[in-house]
Design a protein with these regions (language model features):
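Positively charged, amphipathic and often flexible ligand-engagement surfaces
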Residues: 4-328
């Protein structure tokens, strides 16, 4: 149950974190980095069906088709080409090239006005050379602007937070609509929300899905939820455009209340949800007049993304476990 006040929100809920659920989440996030488990999962009979639930497809045409369907239902979209932790310059260039093809396709199909793209800097070589990642991201931003849309730069683990925000700041000098992502489970994020929610800013707030040490990130679900609400307040009080990424009914209800309190109209912020998760709720929010954007991943590098989705929803892991024992 949540209790709303005029100056903030206090959440009363499960006071005891499920120890088993936390342990399972840690195991899943560790497995997300394991190439051996990736090979095992890739051969499981159920893998492809679960992948299709969360991933639009492997090709550019699949991504465009998914966006077309969402647009027909009154939903906005952000497209993400799966891939991260690039280890070669050529791979970073290939990722850039795919985004350029994607943006050209969106423009040709007249879908760019309702669709932005999300980019991970590590897929553009951030860990090899931050300047390379900036330059390639800049090319993507320029192509997006030419197509009539924009870019949101995804956030990854805490080791690249400062580098990512620095690159976003540089990109915004020429492309002011470029968005950033902040993760509520990081202890620093409430301050980041206050400092970054200036005029023209676009901030996507999510809970966070990477494995982080307690020194930098809240570990209990209750603490993460409370941080999320404090961050919502900071963004709603700011002068930017909040993009609230959550599937949690409590947090959606709180966000609607906070928007009213800060005199924000339904088109002055948006909700975001992942492709394949709570589609009925996505349609409900859009029908009620809220801007509802769906995060749509595509491509063949789905393993790490899917494992983080399972970590967020550990019940999904049971389906995979059963499939591994029943492989033919």
């Amino acid at each position: 149950m949540s209790v709303l006040t005029r100056y903030g929100t206090v959440i009363y809920g499960r006071t005891l974190e499920g120890y088993a659920a936390n342990m399972l989440r840690s195991v899943i996030l560790a497995a997300a980095r394991s190439s051996r488990i990736e090979r095992l999962i890739g051969t499981a009979p159920v893998s492809r069906s679960l992948v299709r639930r969360y991933v639009a497809g492997e090709a550019t045409a699949d991504a465009v088709a998914a966006v077309r369907t969402l647009a027909a239902d009154g939903l906005l979209a952000t497209l993400y080409y799966l891939g991260e932790d690039t280890v070669a310059v050529e791979q970073a260039h290939a990722t850039r090239d795919e985004y350029l093809r994607l943006l050209a396709a969106l423009d040709e199909e007249h879908l760019a006005r309702t669709t932005e793209v999300s980019v991970k800097l590590s897929a553009l070589g951030q860990r090899l050379d931050a300047e390379l990642a900036h330059d390639l991201a800049r090319e993507i931003c320029a192509a997006a602007a030419d197509s009539g849309t924009t870019v949101t730069v995804d956030m990854e683990d805490h080791t690249v937070t400062d580098s990512t925000l620095e690159i976003v700041a540089r990109l915004r000098e020429d492309f002011p609509s470029v968005g950033a992502v902040l993760q509520a489970y990081l202890r620093r994020t409430e301050d980041d929300c206050r400092s970054l929610a200036g005029p023209g800013s676009r901030i996507r707030l999510c809970k966070g899905a990477y494995r982080e040490p307690e020194s930098v990130a809240y570990q209990r679900r209750l603490d993460i939820d409370r941080s999320y609400v404090r961050c919502v307040n900071a963004l709603m009080a700011g002068e930017g455009y909040p993009m609230l990424a959550t599937h949690d009914p409590r947090l959606i209800e709180i966000a609607v209340d906070r928007a009213r309190w800060f005199d924000r109209e339904p088109d002055d912020f948006e909700f975001q949800m992942l492709f394949g998760i709570r589609p009925t709720e996505q349609l409900r929010l859009a029908a009620e007049g809220y801007r509802m954007r769906v995060y749509v991943p595509y491509g063949d590098q789905w393993y790490g993304y899917l494992m983080r989705r399972m970590a967020e929803r550990p019940a999904n892991a049971a389906v995979f476990t059963r499939s591994l024992w029943s492989r033919s």
